[in-house]
Amino acid sequence: MFENNRVRIAMQKTGRLSKDSIRLLTSCGVKINLKQQKLIAFAENMPIDVMLVRDDDIPGLVMDGVVDLGIVGENVLEEELLKRKSQKSECSYITLRRLDFGVCRLSLALPVNTIYTNITCLKNIRIATSYPHLLKKYLDEKNISFKSCMLNGSVEVAPRAGLADAICDLVSTGATLEANGLREVQVVYHSHACLICKTGNINSIKKEFINKLMTRIKGVIKARESKYIMLHAPIKQLEAVISLLHGAERPTILKLAGDDNRVAMHMVSSETLFWETMEKLKLLGASSILVLPIEKMME
C-alpha cells in the first residue's frame, strides 16, 4: 500500500524513456532500487514511490488520480487526451515541465518507390499507426480522408505485409524507416518527454515536496544545458570575449599573477560552446580555454 504522504510517480518500465527517466531521478538525488521485474519501487531517502508501467498507461494514471506525477512522451499524452475527449472521459492534468530528453516526431512515411508531391497524395489510402487520434486530428485539419489501420507495434512492416499503403509512426533518426524501405514525407507532431501532475486534492506535504523536486529537476536540466568556461584574456579584449559567450550572469574576473595586461575569466555559459567560438576566442588573444561540464546547478 502507498502511504498518503509519499509522492507517487509513474514512469515507463522499459523502452525509449525509461533510462532517461531513471537518470533524471538519480541526478536529483533520489536513491531508488529499480528492478525491471518489480512494478513498484520505493525511494530510500525521499518520500517517493515509483510505478513502472507501460508508457501509454501513464497519462490515464495521472488523469484518474492514481499517481501524483508522470514522466511521459508528449505524443502519448496527446493521444490519450484526444481519446478521452472523444469518449467524454476525465482528462484533466497539469504539465509541470517539458524535459530535455525523449525528442522525436510522429511522421507519415511511404514506401520509397511511391510518388509523393503533397499531402493530397494521402487521400483515401490506408495508413497504419499506433496513434489513430493524433493522425485523425492532423488529417482532418487538412481535409484529407483516409482509412486507419490500428497496430500496437511493428508499424513499419505494414506496407510490406500488405496491411497498409503508408504508416504514421515515431521517428528519431529515420534508420528504422530506411531499413524497411520507407521514407518520411510529413511530420504530424513534434514531441519531448514531459512531467505531468494530477489535478485535484494534493495535500500540503506532497505539494511542498513536489516543489522541492521541481527545483532539483530545473537545476539538473539547466546544468546539462550549461558549461563552465575558464580562460585567460587580454584586458583590452575583455568585452569582445564576453560578447561571444552567452552567460547566465556576468563573469568572474581575476587578476593573473605577474601579468598586468591579462586576466582570468570564469563564467557559466548557457549555450553549447562550438569549436568555431573557441577559434574566435583564440583570435581575440584568449588562451588556456577550458570548457567543463556542470553536474548540478541552482540559481
Curated annotation (Swiss-Prot):
Q: What is its main location?
A: cytoplasm
- The superkingdom listed in its UniProt entry is Bacteria
Entry protein name: ATP phosphoribosyltransferase
UniProt-listed PROSITE patterns: ATP_P_PHORIBOSYLTR
Question: Which one GO biological process term can you cite for this protein?
Answer: L-histidine biosynthetic process
Q: What class of enzyme is it?
A: transferase
How is the subunit organization of this protein annotated in UniProt?
Equilibrium between an active dimeric form, an inactive hexameric form and higher aggregates. Interconversion between the various forms is largely reversible and is influenced by the natural substrates and inhibitors of the enzyme.
Q: Which key words tag this protein in UniProt?
A: Amino-acid biosynthesis, ATP-binding, Cytoplasm, Glycosyltransferase, Histidine biosynthesis, Magnesium, Metal-binding, Nucleotide-binding, Transferase
**Record's InterPro entries?**
ATP-PRT_HisG_long, ATP_PRibTrfase_cat, ATP_PRibTrfase_CS, ATP_PRibTrfase_HisG, HisG_C, N-reg_PII-like_a/b, N-reg_PII/ATP_PRibTrfase_C
Entry's Gene Ontology molecular function annotations: ATP binding; ATP phosphoribosyltransferase activity; magnesium ion binding
- So what does this thing catalyse? 1-(5-phospho-beta-D-ribosyl)-ATP + diphosphate = 5-phospho-alpha-D-ribose 1-diphosphate + ATP
Enzyme Commission numbers on file: 2.4.2.17
Q: Which family does it belong to?
A: Belongs to the ATP phosphoribosyltransferase family. Long subfamily.
Q: How is its activity regulated?
A: Feedback inhibited by histidine.
- Protein species of origin: Buchnera aphidicola subsp. Acyrthosiphon pisum (strain APS) (Acyrthosiphon pisum symbiotic bacterium)
Q: Which cofactor does it need?
A: Mg(2+)
Give Gene Ontology CC terms: cytoplasm
Among its keywords, does the record have Chloroplast?
no
| Location of the protein in the cell | Cytoplasm
Which pathway does UniProt place it in?
A: Amino-acid biosynthesis; L-histidine biosynthesis; L-histidine from 5-phospho-alpha-D-ribose 1-diphosphate: step 1/9
Role played: Catalyzes the condensation of ATP and 5-phosphoribose 1-diphosphate to form N'-(5'-phosphoribosyl)-ATP (PR-ATP). Has a crucial role in the pathway because the rate of histidine biosynthesis seems to be controlled primarily by regulation of HisG enzymatic activity.
> Would the keyword Metal-binding turn up in this protein's UniProt record?
yes
